[in-house]
């Protein structure tokens, strides 16, 4: 184990099963043709939990069931997740199936149903095959925990699993935070199809955890966009089981800032991996905005840039077309003074004082041939800073989504 100072946060190899007292599993139950499609995270003790959900008017059945679980109390012992079928827009039967899924898994664990969260992702409007779900739950009982199995089970059109892990010191105790996520298309959260699961062995007050998650989600998961589409099933769930045996964290605790920073890093990692793995994507795009009127304006501008199809296609085509960036900034809802906007790409200034600046097209093109592109916007409206992440738009995005159900 790494020896940590009180203000040190270290990224380590790990996932949602790395914090003490957690295990994760994934199996193939038959919802997908061959890949794993049913995953669970289990805590050995009740975990203080917090969640944020999709803002879609068509919230999926599993979202409603998870909300019901957390209404009964702020603790969970497990979450069960299926891929392939979203169980969204499926009426009363879909809601019944989600509750049955919760009860079946709770029964296997010997716990109250309200201690289980439920999540689904996949095709909208199709019902779950409950025989396969029940068979999968039985299979999970006999399946050993395995690194990466849960992460694989929650994927849909994703091309890679998404996981991260950090360690930090709280009051002389080593605390671990692990994360897993899925998301590739329909990504434009407030919350998009994106699921995030974070586990930690820290002891935390529920109110502080829920507030931190909302604040962090706004500057991480809600600052990514792949295609501007929002899903019915988005959810980010955090479970904190206290197995690190630290003094319970509250907002007034001296170690709260370092824990909150580690939680932010965890969510940022997952958010960027989702953006990087956008359907058909070849490049991660990050927009950094400095000197906006406030942080809200900065985040609005940053997300407008990475969400612009014209910017995304220019990046794919390695074309340093700064006019597309200006176009995105220009129709944002933020306060913008044209003469005070500067645009930088790969260290070169492309635009300043409301006019183009001389720059090397060849150097810009070479920079755009990389797989991580950062666009920097400098303003003089105030002290607001913000970031957002997206990806390029390629021909493969159309191919993937034109045949999504076939």
Curated annotation (Swiss-Prot):
Annotated site residues (Involved in the stabilization of negative charge on the oxyanion by the formation of the oxyanion hole) in this chain: 121-122
GO molecular function, one term: glutamate N-acetyltransferase activity
UniProt-annotated location(s): Cytoplasm
Residues at which substrate binds: 156, 182, 193, 279, 401, 406
Gene3D superfamilies: arginine biosynthesis bifunctional protein suprefamily, ArgJ beta chain, C-terminal domain, L-amino peptidase D-ALA esterase/amidase
Key words of the record: Acyltransferase, Amino-acid biosynthesis, Arginine biosynthesis, Autocatalytic cleavage, Cytoplasm, Multifunctional enzyme, Transferase
Cleavage, annotated site positions: 192-193
Activation/inhibition comment: Feedback inhibition by L-arginine.
Pathway noted in the entry: Amino-acid biosynthesis; L-arginine biosynthesis; L-ornithine and N-acetyl-L-glutamate from L-glutamate and N(2)-acetyl-L-ornithine (cyclic): step 1/1; Amino-acid biosynthesis; L-arginine biosynthesis; N(2)-acetyl-L-ornithine from L-glutamate: step 1/4
Catalyzed reaction equations: N(2)-acetyl-L-ornithine + L-glutamate = N-acetyl-L-glutamate + L-ornithine; L-glutamate + acetyl-CoA = N-acetyl-L-glutamate + CoA + H(+)
Enzyme Commission number: 2.3.1.35, 2.3.1.1
Cellular component, GO annotation: cytoplasm
InterPro entries: Arg_biosynth_ArgJ, ArgJ-like_dom_sf, ArgJ_beta_C
Enzyme class: transferase
Coiled coil regions, renumbered to chain: none
GO biological process: L-arginine biosynthetic process; ornithine biosynthetic process
Main localization of the protein described in the UniProt heading: cytoplasm
Listed HAMAP family: ArgJ
Quaternary organization: Heterotetramer of two alpha and two beta chains.
Protein name, per record: Arginine biosynthesis bifunctional protein ArgJ
Upper taxonomic lineage: Bacteria, Bacillati, Bacillota, Bacilli, Bacillales
Gene name for this UniProt entry: argJ
């Amino acid at each position: 184990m790494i020896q940590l100072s009180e203000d040190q946060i270290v990224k380590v190899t790990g996932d949602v099963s790395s914090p003490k007292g957690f295990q994760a599993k994934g199996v193939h139950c038959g919802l997908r043709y061959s890949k794993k499609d049913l995953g669970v995270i289990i805590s050995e003790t009740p975990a203080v939990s917090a969640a944020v959900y999709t803002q879609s008017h068509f919230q999926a059945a599993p979202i409603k069931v998870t909300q019901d679980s957390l209404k009964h109390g702020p603790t969970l012992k497990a979450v069960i997740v299926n891929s392939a079928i979203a169980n969204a827009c499926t009426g009363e039967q879909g809601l019944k199936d989600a509750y049955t899924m919760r009860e079946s898994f709770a029964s296997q664990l010997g716990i109250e149903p309200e201690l289980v969260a439920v999540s689904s992702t996949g095709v909208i409007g199709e019902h779950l095959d409950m025989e396969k779900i029940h068979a999968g739950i039985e299979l999970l009982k006999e399946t050993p925990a395995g690194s990466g199995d849960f992460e694989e089970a929650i994927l849909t059109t994703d091309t890679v699993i998404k996981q991260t892990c950090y360690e930090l010191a709280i009051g002389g105790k080593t605390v671990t935070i692990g994360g897993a996520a899925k998301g590739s298309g329909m990504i434009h959260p407030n919350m998009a199809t994106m699921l995030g699961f974070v586990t930690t062995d820290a002891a935390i007050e529920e109110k502080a955890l829920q507030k931190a998650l909302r604040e962090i989600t706004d500057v991480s998961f809600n600052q990514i966009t792949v295609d501007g589409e929002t899903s019915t099933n988005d959810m980010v769930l955090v479970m904190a089981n206290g197995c690190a045996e630290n003094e319970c964290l509250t907002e007034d605790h001296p170690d709260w800032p370092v824990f909150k920073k580690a939680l932010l890093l965890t969510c940022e990692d997952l958010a960027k991996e989702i953006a990087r793995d956008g359907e058909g994507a070849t490049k991660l795009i990050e927009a950094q905005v400095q000197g906006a009127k406030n942080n809200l304006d900065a985040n609005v501008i940053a997300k407008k840039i990475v969400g612009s199809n014209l910017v995304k296609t220019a990046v794919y085509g390695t074309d340093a077309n700064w006019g597309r960036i200006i176009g995105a900034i220009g129709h944002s809802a933020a306060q913008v003074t044209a003469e005070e906007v500067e645009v930088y790409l790969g260290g070169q200034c492309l635009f300043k004082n409301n006019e183009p600046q001389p720059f090397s097209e060849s150097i810009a093109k070479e920079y755009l041939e990389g797989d991580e592109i950062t666009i920097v916007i400098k303003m003089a409206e105030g002290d607001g800073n913000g970031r957002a992440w997206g990806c390029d738009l390629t021909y493969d995005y159309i191919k993937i989504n034109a045949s999504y159900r076939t």
